[in-house]
């Protein structure tokens, strides 16, 4: 089989994967799920309070991914403003154009929260959206 292996095997990546799996195992799946749920609930509460922001997809029990649009501004413009404040979001159709057509939107911003995010990250996003909203008002 050696003749089919080009280059150096991904040894460092394998070690990194082992360390990541150990970290997740140490934290425990239940603790991770509880943390992500708490951050997602907090994000839903805070984002829902922003005037002129429309959340796309609000199914009960959804995870920590939030697609949204801000009235009067294109998603790419919102993403650019957020980037200036060090906030990373994705903007566009997210390879889901038929779904966006169903919701009647051309593009969205999408923010994701996971194990490594906290409520302070949600607050930073909300503050950035408010700044962008005022800029485009």
Q: Residues of each region from the PLM?
A:
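Pyridoxal 5′-phosphate
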Residues: 1-137
